């Protein structure tokens, strides 16, 4: 197993992983064409988001992670956010999530990022436990939204 930066040929896998992540995390069904459009934009412009894939011995993606950056004027640097992360069920519970996180953390440190953050659906207990096992902790902040 190894982690590498995603390439355009990985797009079908990334679309599938993202759709499955949304279904598992929120019970929501996403439109594949919309996912493809959004992921493709980021694959072509890494300033929007960066994707990595975990591949098996045949170089077939079995999981992915994407990260975005948020500027902090208070700290004059970028916070890195896990935007999405997914592992195929057959690869869960084997320490493979840490391979994906290590790739993100490595690049974040190279670019002098401030810290790695993520948000997780409050009812997704499996993901919360996995992130806690990866040493993420709860923040003092809550996410709030203003809908159109």
Located regions from the model:
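Acetyl-CoA-dependent GNAT
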Residues: 5-9, 16-77, 83, 101-103, ...
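Conserved active-site alpha-helix within GNAT-family acetyltransferase domains
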Residues: 98, 122-140, 146
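Hydrophobic adenine-recognition pocket in adenosine-nucleotide-binding enzymes
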Residues: 6, 85-87, 120
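Extreme N-terminal starter segment of soluble prokaryotic enzymes
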Residues: 1-2
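Conserved GNAT acetyl-CoA-binding A-motif
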Residues: 109-119
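Conserved acetyl-CoA pyrophosphate-binding loop and the N-cap/start of the following alpha-helix
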Residues: 91, 95-103
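Short alpha-helical
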Residues: 9, 13, 125-126
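A short, internal acetyl-CoA/4′-phosphopantetheine-binding micro-motif in the GNAT/acyltransferase core
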Residues: 82-92
């Amino acid at each position: 197993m190894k982690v590498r930066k995603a390439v355009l040929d990985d797009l079908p896998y990334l679309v599938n992983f993202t759709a499955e992540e949304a279904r598992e995390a929120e019970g929501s069904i996403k439109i594949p064409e919309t996912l493809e459009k959004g992921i493709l934009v980021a694959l072509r412009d890494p300033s929007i988001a960066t994707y990595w894939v975990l591949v098996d011995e045949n170089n077939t993606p079995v999981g992915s992670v994407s990260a975005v950056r948020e500027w902090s004027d208070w700290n004059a640097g970028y916070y890195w956010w896990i935007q999405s992360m997914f592992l195929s069920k057959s690869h869960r519970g084997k320490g493979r999530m840490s391979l994906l996180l290590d790739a993100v953390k490595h690049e974040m440190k190279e670019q002098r990022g401030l810290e790695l953050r993520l948000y997780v659906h409050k009812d997704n207990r499996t993901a919360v436990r996995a992130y806690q096992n990866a040493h993420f902790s709860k923040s003092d902040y809550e996410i709030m939204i203003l809908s159109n």
